[in-house]
Amino acid sequence: MAKFKLSLVQFLVSPVKSDNLNRACKLIKEAAQKGAQIVALPECFNSPYGTTYFPEYAEKIPGESTELLSQVAKECGIYLIGGSIPEEDCGKLYNTCAVFGPDGTLLVKHRKIHLFDIDVPGKIRFQESETLSPGDSFSVFDTPYCKVGVGICYDIRFAELAQIYANKGCQLLVYPGAFNMTTGPAHWELLQRARALDNQVYVATASPARDEKASYVAWGHSTIVSPWGEVVAKAGSEETVLSAEIDLQYLAEIREQIPIRRQRRRDLYNVEEKRN
């Protein structure tokens, strides 16, 4: 299939987990009814984002949130990239994205590889490593449309991860994310366009809607970028479902016109995975 519809659910996350789950499911169903074949939720879609919240909202996988995602994916017959939730496993906490197929099967579980530890004086300091542990595996899943690679938020800053996914045959990279009011306006779109252009892939980011009253204010602006580096769809800061057509024939044409994949000097340099 040369084309398919991707939808990103950007919704306002509240402190009430049940409200978040109900809202997410409602918007997922709306996207599916309008023809979406792959749907993605934002980072930390079931809980507020913050180191104090992660232990409070953490769940096992399978658990309440992921079981609900499995059910709605099966009900709608879609591929569902379940944003991320705080996951508890063997006494450790992870920022984890669970992906489900049209039959409700768990296809992949991506634990955020690169933890969000930054300190911009006078603007923002955040240390995910105060409560979270990093993941240590790549996350790729197959669909009838194309192969998809998954990262979470800060993972997008690392060009190597995107290149490894592209080398594995991914044509779409999806990053549930929650950039903030400092890094969002400066880097959010830039990083997406860079990853798309570098690897000649589609890149999509699903953000929570902006809540000015939250302790951590998300930038919003969920986005879909083409392999030409062009923004094909971009949300504002409010709650919405953003959709775009992913055109794999267009991707193939770009790769043929500018054949960087064949032109790389692997005799001089290479990016490779250390663990499978």
From Swiss-Prot:
InterPro entries: C-N_Hydrolase, C-N_Hydrolase_sf, Nit1/2_C-N_Hydrolase
Subcellular location, principal: cytoplasm
Listed GO CC annotations: mitochondrion
GO MF annotations, alphabetized: 2-oxoglutaramate amidase activity; omega-amidase activity
Membrane-crossing segments per the record: none
Keyword line: Cytoplasm, Hydrolase
EC number: 3.5.1.3
Enzyme superclass (EC): hydrolase
Any single biological process term in GO: glutamine metabolic process
UniProt subcellular location: Cytoplasm
SUPFAM superfamilies: Carbon-nitrogen hydrolase
Pfam families to which the protein is assigned, alphabetical: CN_hydrolase
Active site per UniProt: 43, 112, 153
Described function: Has omega-amidase activity. The role of omega-amidase is to remove potentially toxic intermediates by converting 2-oxoglutaramate and 2-oxosuccinamate to biologically useful 2-oxoglutarate and oxaloacetate, respectively.
UniProt family annotation: Belongs to the carbon-nitrogen hydrolase superfamily. NIT1/NIT2 family.
Protein name (Swiss-Prot/TrEMBL): Omega-amidase NIT2-A
Gene name of the record: nit2a
